[in-house]
Design a protein with these regions (language model features):
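Conserved, single-site charged/polar hotspot
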Residues: 1-234
């Protein structure tokens, strides 16, 4: 494997905060994308704003999957539905028709920094009651009404060094996320994939130490890289 991101066929969502006792649900990634967009934004917004927000939502989720953010902490899911940590997902809800159509078009497109391999950790908030370093959801509506394209909206909030990765390959779970929690002593192909990814990411973040032996064994060097990675992306 190249260590390049795949679009997962499915994603496992924890229906609560990370440490909260709550069920997990596994849904097709495209279904997840349509659900989050229907839960986070409004279908009546200008299409440029909807597209920009959906690209941020997709990239955020793919960053969680690609980096094994929760799996490397010993959890058995990829992402939560808590807006305190991740993005809103309402299990079983109906989705809006125009958003469903856009999800079918966009689910295998994401944003990343030029020269980086990992999908952008594209934080966002509503921009009215909550503000943050990332995109303002309501601010994106104003920019769309001012004639901004989805890409220009994204660069207004995340910086100009963005590129869209289109038609990313869809992979099985083996290509995308660890299937079980990873910890010191784990030895399997999931660990090997994690090692490849951490070494790729460390090209852009030199504070993350290189793992000298990509051998699928979760030993001290891998643990040190995971710890530094978690500090960087926390």
């Amino acid at each position: 494997p190249t260590g390049l991101p795949y679009i997962p066929e499915s994603i496992t969502v924890h229906l609560g905060r990370p440490d909260e006792s709550a069920p997990n649900v596994t849904v097709p990634f495209q279904t997840y994308v349509a659900n989050v967009a229907s839960s986070e934004i409004y279908p009546t917004w200008p299409e440029s704003a909807i597209r920009a927000n959906m690209l941020a939502q997709i990239s955020f989720a793919l960053n969680r999957v690609y980096t094994g953010y929760y799996r490397t902490r010993g959890y058995d899911f990829d992402i939560t539905n808590s807006t305190q940590y991740d993005q809103y997902f309402v299990n079983g809800r109906d989705v809006f028709e125009n958003i469903q159509q856009l999800a079918a078009e966009l689910f295998n497109t994401y944003i990343r920094r030029v020269g980086n391999v990992e999908p952008l950790f594209a934080q966002y908030c509503n921009g009215t009651t909550v503000t943050c370093n990332g995109m303002s959801q309501w601010g994106s509506v104003d920019l769309a009404r001012a004639g901004y394209t989805p890409y220009r909206i994204l660069t207004a909030y995340y910086g100009s060094d963005l590129e869209l990765v289109r038609n990313a390959p869809v992979g099985t779970v083996q290509n995308t996320a660890p299937t079980s929690p990873l910890r010191l002593g784990s030895a399997n192909n999931d660990v090997r994939l994690l090692q490849i990814r951490l070494n790729r990411i460390s090209n852009n973040y030199p504070n993350i130490p290189k793992i000298p032996y990509v051998n699928g064994i979760f030993a001290d060097a891998t643990e040190n890289a995971v710890r530094e990675f978690q500090k960087t992306f926390n």
